[in-house]
């Protein structure tokens, strides 16, 4: 019994410790010019003093500003320049934010959607300093850990007017145990030890800062949850938990197969080529934020 508990306690730091060690150096990054954009490079400063690399894609009289954030170890948020180009065609501005400890952004530790909430809040604060974007709705759009961060940030940031989340986890402890494939009651025991590790690492005062709980705080704000049914990185159970806890009006779209990036293979920089995906995202934005 004691040996088993020690094993359960040892697994979270052994597995998660190396995963959260930064900074992450991306093998591939993209430029706005790859999709005929001329972005404005800016630096954001978080409430804990980190400088983050970010890229504006401006449009005239924007219908909304979409703040993009990416995943745990990639891709770089610059992969979303294609999304920004697609959105610009329909009158949406974009702010692409490289999360802490990744690429050109400062930081030494991946925050597992706890610390990264500060990054999204820094983006919101920056948008609010731009006179051209006064009173323009702000939409948080994230992939994987970025999707979890977008949900968490919306839960604690009333200035975020909407959310688009791709392949988000419902909580780190839940996706951790989902990927282990443990049956009950072992899964519950392991989750408890993962939560204990997260408390010591990120603070026990943040135990409610998880997407499954923060999505309940959306109120009437629109949100779109997207996931692939066979996702092997963030299993579909996370999507099911998020959908179960979301307000009734929250929209969902499920892609069959294992597609963690959701967009059809080879089309992430050109998302308009994936017509089903593009129409889902643009339809959601148009219904809630279009002119």
Question: Which residue ranges define each predicted feature?
Answer:
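An N-terminal hydrophobic leader/cap segment in hydrolases
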Residues: 2-45, 55
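The serine-hydrolase catalytic nucleophile loop
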Residues: 72-86, 99
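Conserved alpha/beta-hydrolase
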Residues: 86-106
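Alpha/beta-hydrolase active-site loop
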Residues: 111-131
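Hydrolase active-site cap/lid region
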Residues: 152-204
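Short beta-strand/loop motif that positions the catalytic acidic residue
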Residues: 218-219, 225-227, 231
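Conserved alpha/beta-hydrolase "acid-adjacent" motif
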Residues: 232-238
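C-terminal catalytic histidine-bearing segment of alpha/beta-hydrolase fold enzymes
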Residues: 240, 244-291
